[in-house]
């Protein structure tokens, strides 16, 4: 129907429009509803086995024209949706049902009034929501009543500072429900006055609500939400991509000779990373694979510069909310080294990492797509000592990283994660045996132990709540072997590490370098 206009006939006092009966549901989906004084609408179908809200009698109006001056009775298995289509009303209830224990039926919600945006109730108008009604019974003029097992459903995004049922007095049974969709922090004034203390249910498990003096107050549980955000692993896995790139550059510059010609190199590897004991039960496990390609050249007998690109792909999974995050990470970087003496070297590197995160979860509101970026600048110094047949190379450096995470929405809640600035102090000692000749190949076994204390914004700030997210005390061990024949060098290495909050990782890589 385009417009449902209910007004009294000339020879009668009241015009009644029934919707549904004891045998079947009736459904009216109008573009506009104009309900005049002394007119009434009654909805009442019988219950059927397996009934859902889609089987209920429905009166929906995409727009309410003027004040509601007539009477509406919402009986058993019935729904009235004001300023909403029927499809949107069904979707709104299902949002609520999916986030709570509410069901539609004789043991759950038996009748509902959905107010998608505020309406005006005239002094002659009334609405009675009562799921036991099988014959018309109307509330007093100017009143809205919701009986036990009845539901008043409101879209918080459309209410703002207005009154949901303006001009009405609202009476709600203590066993009735106020349902809030698109729930977020805020207050909702339901009516000019309210009697009763209904149960408040939201479509967002991170938002709770209660009713006091006719006002619903909704509050976001930022602590719980922060734990869910940390379980996505977004910030730490962006940092891991940045760290893997930095380690690759460190290995390359440690091996290269300043005066060599153009060198091309490729590294391919993967790792398993786990964080099991973050704040608020946050945890995840990730599998990532990386491939890096770079080129460098000697520009003076003491200096060498290069550039590289790294691509990473994988996923992290958490038992919390069934979270899975499909991650792609691209890193671009520049690096250079300068030989201060034959044994001492200074290395600098710059990297930009961009990650995309495709998050899915059993809690549907956590499903999101958003990006994170890391900008890093680092410098380190190393010195080589020959002790018998072993070269020992200690190094110390400093790296500053800026981690930025895009905002995203969890239902009606906007999540802003503050940018993080961290300062890392990589300390390492590498051990390399003198070359072993084998049929024209020079074999070089090596090992490296590193410790990187981290300072700064190691926690993410989610809506004002600080949540642990980054490992600030990572320890890493590597063992590898390189084999050189002429201009080509092959390498392979295994790695393992541990850190704060039960963080641990293990992985491996292979690589090849060709010097022209």
Residue ranges and their predicted role:
Residues 17-19, 133, 493-497:
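Short strand-loop junctions, especially beta-strand C-caps/beta-turns
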Residues 8-10, 15-24, 40-50, 54-117, ...:
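Outer-membrane translocation/initiation segment of Type V secreted surface proteins
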Residues 144-146:
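Fold-core signature of tandem repeat domains
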Residues 224, 232, 259-516:
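Membrane translocator/pore-forming domains, dominated by Gram-negative outer-membrane beta-barrels
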């Amino acid at each position: 129907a385009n417009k449902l206009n209910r007004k009294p006939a000339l020879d009668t006092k009241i015009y009644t429009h029934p919707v549904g009966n004891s045998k079947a549901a009736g459904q009216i989906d109008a573009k506009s509803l104009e309900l005049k004084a002394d007119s009434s609408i009654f909805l009442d179908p019988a219950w059927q086995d397996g009934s859902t809200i889609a089987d209920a009698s429905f009166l929906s109006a995409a727009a309410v024209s003027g004040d509601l001056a007539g009477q509406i009775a919402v009986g058993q298995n019935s729904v009235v949706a004001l300023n909403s289509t029927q499809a949107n009303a069904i979707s709104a209830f299902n949002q609520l049902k999916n986030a709570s224990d509410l069901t539609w039926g004789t043991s759950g919600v038996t009748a509902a009034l959905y107010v998608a945006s505020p309406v005006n109730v005239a002094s002659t108008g009334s609405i009675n929501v009562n799921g036991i009604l099988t014959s018309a019974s109307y509330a007093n003029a100017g009143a809205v009543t919701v009986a036990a097992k009845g539901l008043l459903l409101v879209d918080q995004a459309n209410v703002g500072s207005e009154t949901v049922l303006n001009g009405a007095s609202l009476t709600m049974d203590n066993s009735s429900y106020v349902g809030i969709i698109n729930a977020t922090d805020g207050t909702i004034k339901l009516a000019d006055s309210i009697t009763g203390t209904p149960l408040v249910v939201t479509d967002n498990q991170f938002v709770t609500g209660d009713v006091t003096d006719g006002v619903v107050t909704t509050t976001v549980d930022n602590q719980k939400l922060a734990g869910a955000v940390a379980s996505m692993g977004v910030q730490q896995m962006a940092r891991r991509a940045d760290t893997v790139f930095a380690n690759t550059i460190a290995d390359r510059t440690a091996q290269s000779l300043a005066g060599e010609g153009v060198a091309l190199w490729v590294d391919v590897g993967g790792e398993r990373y786990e964080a099991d004991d973050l704040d608020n039960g946050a945890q995840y496990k990730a599998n990532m694979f990386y491939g890096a390609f770079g080129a460098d050249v000697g520009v003076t007998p003491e200096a060498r510069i290069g550039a590289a690109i790294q691509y990473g792909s994988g996923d992290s999974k958490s038992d919390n909310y069934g979270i899975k995050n499909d991650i792609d990470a691209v890193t671009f970087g520049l690096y250079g080294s300068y030989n201060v003496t034959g044994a001492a070297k200074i290395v600098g590197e710059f990297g930009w990492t961009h990650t995309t995160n495709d998050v899915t979860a059993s809690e549907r509101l956590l499903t999101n797509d958003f990006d994170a970026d890391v900008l890093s600048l680092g410098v380190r110094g190393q010195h080589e000592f020959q002790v018998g047949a072993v070269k020992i190379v200690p190094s110390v450096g400093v790296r500053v990283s800026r981690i930025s995470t895009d905002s995203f929405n969890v239902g009606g809640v906007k999540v802003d994660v503050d940018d993080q600035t961290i300062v890392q102090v990589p300390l390492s000692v590498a051990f390399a045996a003198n070359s072993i000749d084998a049929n024209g190949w020079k074999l070089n076994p090596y090992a490296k132990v590193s410790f990187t204390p981290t300072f700064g914004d190691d926690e993410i700030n989610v809506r004002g709540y600080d949540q642990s997210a980054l490992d600030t005390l990572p320890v890493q061990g590597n063992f590898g072997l390189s084999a050189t024949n002429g201009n080509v060098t092959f390498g392979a290495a295994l790695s393992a590490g541990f850190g704060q909050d039960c963080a641990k990782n293990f992985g491996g890589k292979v690589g090849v370098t060709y010097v022209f």
